[in-house]
């Protein structure tokens, strides 16, 4: 049974000229194909800001997979979903497929 590593680097995000926020993700998550992967991102600003999730594969540009905490762009499979609770947001990939192996980044942005 193969394991799919989902690599999750720490991302520090500056949102505007006067403020910067640190978002923390776990170093990595590995799951077997068909399992559910839950990737968390924590930061003090998250209750006041929307979270955005990006998938990036080697040699490719990042792809937005979730915006405004839980909205899924057109063309993104339904197995990708997002949720938010307090200072933590979660990207869930249900029924992980081999093609989901990638880096996943969270970003925050003002909700106004």
UniProtKB/Swiss-Prot annotation:
Its main location: secreted. Residues 20-112 form the Ig-like domain. The keyword Signal applies. Residues 68-70, 107-112 are annotated as: Complementarity-determining-2. GO terms for molecular function: antigen binding. Residues 1-19 form the signal peptide. GO terms for biological process: adaptive immune response; immune response. One of its GO terms (cellular component) is plasma membrane. Residues 20-41 are annotated as: Framework-1. Disulfide bonds join 41-106. Residues 51-67 are annotated as: Framework-2. Residues 42-50 are annotated as: Complementarity-determining-1. It is found in: Secreted; Cell membrane. V region of the variable domain of immunoglobulin light chains that participates in the antigen recognition. Immunoglobulins, also known as antibodies, are membrane-bound or secreted glycoproteins produced by B lymphocytes. In the recognition phase of humoral immunity, the membrane-bound immunoglobulins serve as receptors which, upon binding of a specific antigen, trigger the clonal expansion and differentiation of B lymphocytes into immunoglobulins-secreting plasma cells. Immunoglobulins are composed of two identical heavy chains and two identical light chains; disulfide-linked. This is Immunoglobulin lambda variable 3-25. It comes from Homo sapiens (Human).
């Amino acid at each position: 049974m193969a394991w799919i590593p989902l690599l999750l680097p720490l991302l520090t995000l500056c949102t505007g000229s006067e403020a910067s926020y640190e978002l923390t993700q776990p170093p990595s998550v590995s799951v077997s194909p068909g399992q559910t992967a839950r990737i968390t991102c924590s930061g003090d600003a998250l209750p006041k800001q929307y979270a955005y999730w990006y998938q990036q594969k080697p040699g490719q540009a990042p792809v937005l997979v979730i915006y405004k905490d839980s909205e899924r762009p057109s063309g993104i499979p339904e197995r990708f979903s997002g949720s938010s609770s307090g200072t933590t947001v979660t990207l869930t990939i249900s029924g992980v497929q081999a093609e989901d192996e990638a880096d996943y980044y969270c970003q925050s942005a003002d909700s106004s």
